[in-house]
């Protein structure tokens, strides 16, 4: 009996050992297949691994083209962010020398030449001069429409172009990875924590700083005007008022004396004939002379030539000029950042990237410069001065381009500059142009419709440019 049991145990033990060996060999084959292959999550890597055990491994990652593409600085920043997150490109056989890079004198010539070309866009306003003038002076409705078009372009540029770039939300970053196996599915998703630091809020703070700085600049300019040229103007008018009044009063007294002496002579000579009527006419003459004297003393700002000058018009004119100067300042800062972007495009991607950036800036600046010109003329600048100062602020782009070329790359903090400029644009458009339009006389249905269409047209142009970009 024991011998028979022993005979049965031997095959059972052999079977168990065989199964154990099979199981171990199966794990030894499947484990290297899982551990030895490396997952390269790249910006354009799509690969599949076929093993003897039919283990298909497909990575669903967003594909990009394998060829070299000339990209703008914003796209470079996107690739740098992906590389820092561990999703760098898997193709290293790019021919970097094939891009038409520029060095030395050619780099400076192309970059500064394109920057000057963008600056010349401000002279597009010369085309508007034949349409703008009616009977030798600028048409009010056309100037108002240009100013509101500029305000709409400013608001659209601030909210649709500058702030998305400053906050880094202009491009979509996809960091979701999905892996499919035959026998199990698993997905990885990155969910960043909702915490804020000073660095995260720096762009928003720069926008608020731009609004506050432009408010302070406006207050400062108003204070200087009121205490320098304003006081001289008031003193000048006050002097003319008293001098003119004194002169008119002396002439009135002299005329009264002459009239009184002649009247006395008439009374003495013809006292018997018309005594009652003469007294009545004398009283009438004296009353009219005294009324003229009182009017000359209490009149409003009567000068030596008899014309009146209203101080309210002078105050309104100086108030509008302040926003004209603020517009020049903000436009200069904006053109400086455009020059920096143009210089970095030439420096990193050569002539192809630089010229593509130039074309975009031209499309971006043409409506902006037209609106700035309208705001300057609306603020009280003459047409010649508006053209000159607008072109002068456009030339600031050359300084931004030269700074990048000397520095060797973009010096950074461009997002803070973009935010600051956006804050200035918002302040000028809302507190300047729109507020002045609401306070400028009587509003009719026709004027309101024209103003609204001009404002929306400026915003629409900014939207189209942002979508094309």
From Swiss-Prot:
Residues 257-279 have a biased composition (Polar residues). Residues 235-246 have a biased composition (Basic residues). Its main location: membrane. It is a multi-pass membrane protein. Residues 47-58, 173-193, 247-256, 292-315 have a biased composition (Basic and acidic residues). Residues 1-28 form the signal peptide. Keywords: Membrane, Signal, Transmembrane, Transmembrane helix, Transport. One of its GO terms (molecular function) is metal ion transmembrane transporter activity. The chain crosses the membrane at residues 114-134, 141-161, 201-221, 387-407, 415-435, 448-468. This is IAA-alanine resistance protein 1. The gene is IAR1.
